Every structure is written in structure tokens, then in C-alpha cells.
Amino acid sequence: MKALVFEAPERALLTHRDIPDPAPGEALVRIAYNSVCGSDLSFYKGVWHGSTYPVVPGHEWSGTVVDVNGPLGAELIGTNVVGDLTVSCGTCAHCTARTPTLCEDLGELGFTRDGACAEYMTIPVGNLRRLPDTLPLRAACQVEPLAVALNAVDRLGVTAGEKVAVMGAGGIGLLLAQAVRLRGGSVTAVAEPVPERRAAALALGVPAAVSGEPGALVELTRTHPDAVPDVVLEASGYPTAVQESLEAVRPGGRVGLVGYRIGETAVMAPHHIVLKVLTIRASMGPGTRFEEAIEVLASGAVTVDALLSHEFALDDYAKALDVALRRADSNTRSYFNLQA
């Protein structure tokens, strides 16, 4: 089978290897689609946490179960699925508290063990989620990032009638905007430096999309008081965006940290936090939102066409990574079609 391997920082190679055998309790999945997200790009550049080289990247995927090792999950053979990247021990204090992303022995598909940038992948059966026939496999590769967005919105407690601003209109940012609406909130503005991504946000009905330059969102809230958000969801990971979020949110408001960049330090003015009595909360991973993400994608309540901007065959991995890294050609998200 073909498999893309990150051998070392900034060194990727397309390899040919045997189809892997699933271990007991695991399934073998034929991958259909896999999208490239910001964490994959950071991993490629060598600035990511808890990752191991060499490894096959990829954790935003969809595919079909072709084999299962053991009785558990045998009914899934021949069905279309997606899956959680988190491979936790299940026994530590964090796992028993149902916070597996904090597992003391955390493994992650596409980072510490081979992921979905390959024609086949093995995965624990318990990580799989079955897809309805009404959800195309192309759209389904966005179930995982949509679950991340839903989890973040819920961790911040966004409720009906609240105003929300989103920092960053990449894949996660555009999904956050739609997740806010599912909870009855309204997105007053998106801040994003890439013009095509701002256009994508506007096409989703966001009323204002500012440049993403430092101070742009704050200036909007000064000139348009109705745009002052109750909640700011920071999805870009850029250090300056954290300070901007603190300044833009209303007194008594909430700031959610969703995006992050390893090795970069945000310089903040703590008086904004204290004087405005702000709540800052982080969110990581899909939590328990996979099933809902599948449901709303299948129903059409969330659209991902604007996210999946550039399709590539796995053979064209170098161009896929280059376009994504440079945000070239109006790129929002590169993805691999492994059925091609």
C-alpha cells in the first residue's frame, strides 16, 4: 500500500509497505479521504508535542472497515466509519475521570502511531464511529474537526442569544462559527488575515470579517458596539490574538483558547483579565461530540464545502503540503482523496 511518512522535521516521503495487520481489538480501515490540518503542518515543521518520527500522519479521515481482529466490532466490516485519534490507557486517573486527552500514557493516531495518510490504517475498534449512508465520505473526513469545534463551544458554555467572535477562519474557525449557531448563538465577527478565508466566513453568513491584524477586532467593537462579543473563541494560535481576545470581549465575558502553537509565547496584559473579571478556558480535542458531529453533517445543518478547498492524490503530497503551508491558491484545507 501507499503511505505518506513524516521521517523527520520537514522531511516527508511516499513509501510502499505491506497492509498492516490489526492487533486484537483493532480494525483495519481502507481510507477514503484525509484532510490536512494545522497540527499536521506543525508536526511536519517539527514544532508539535508528543509526536514520534517516523510516523504516518493524518487524523481527520473517513473510510471503510475491511477487517476486525476479534469478535468486538465484527458487525462493522463493510461499513463506512470515522474515528477518534485519541488512544488512551483507560486506567489512569484522567481516563477514569473521562478526560482521555489528559491520559498519562496518551497515544494519538497520526502523531505517535501511524495515521490516515495511507491507503489502510489500523485503529482500536472502540475509537470507530459508524456513518449513515446519507453522509458522503468526502464530507465525513471533517467529522473529527467539527467535533473539536462543538466540544469547544460547549466547554465555553455558549448559549442561545450570546454574541461570539472567532479569531481565525481556517478549518476550525469556520466550523466554530457554525457550531455557535447550532447552540443558538450569533457570530458577530471573524478576524482572519487571509482574504479568501474572510470571504468564506462571509459566505457562511458572518456579518463582519476583519483583517486579523493586531487591533482590527478591537477597532470593530469600538465603532460597532453591537459587535462586542460575550465570548471570543481564539482558533488561530497566534500569540497576539490572545491579547486581542482579552481586549475585545465584554466585561464579565469568556475567552476560549482552542488554537495553539508550540514554542510561541503570548504576551498578555493581565489587567484586562482582572478589571473585566474575565473567564479564560481551554479546549482540546473532540470530547464526546463525535455522534453529534456525524448527525449535523448528515442533516446538512453544517456545511464543509468551503473548508475542503484543494483535493490531491497521495502521490502529490509535496504539493498538498506546500499549498497548505503557504496558504496559496485560496487554500483553506488540503485533503487527500485516496480513492482516486
UniProtKB/Swiss-Prot annotation:
Gene3D superfamilies in alphabetical order: Medium-chain alcohol dehydrogenases, catalytic domain, NAD(P)-binding Rossmann-like Domain
Example GO molecular function: oxidoreductase activity
Keywords: Metal-binding, NAD, NADP, Oxidoreductase, Zinc
Name of the protein: 2-deoxy-scyllo-inosamine dehydrogenase
Gene designation per UniProt: rbmC
Necessary cofactors: Zn(2+)
Binding site for Zn(2+) 2: 89, 92, 95, 103
EC top class, as a word: oxidoreductase
Cofactor note: Binds 2 Zn(2+) ions per subunit.
EC number: 1.1.1.329
Role noted for this protein: Catalyzes the oxidation of 2-deoxy-scyllo-inosamine (DOIA) with NAD(+) or NADP(+), forming 3-amino-2,3-dideoxy-scyllo-inosose (amino-DOI).
Binding site for Zn(2+) 1: 37, 59, 144
Organism for this UniProt entry: Streptomyces ribosidificus
UniProt xrefs under InterPro entries: ADH-like_C, ADH-like_N, GroES-like_sf, NAD(P)-bd_dom_sf, Zn_alcohol_dh
Pathway where this protein functions: Metabolic intermediate biosynthesis; 2-deoxystreptamine biosynthesis; 2-deoxystreptamine from D-glucose 6-phosphate: step 3/4; Antibiotic biosynthesis; ribostamycin biosynthesis
Reactions the enzyme catalyzes: 2-deoxy-scyllo-inosamine + NADP(+) = 3-amino-2,3-dideoxy-scyllo-inosose + NADPH + H(+); 2-deoxy-scyllo-inosamine + NAD(+) = 3-amino-2,3-dideoxy-scyllo-inosose + NADH + H(+)
UniProt family annotation: Belongs to the zinc-containing alcohol dehydrogenase family. DOIA dehydrogenase subfamily.
Pfam families on file: ADH_N, ADH_zinc_N
Origin: domain of life: Bacteria
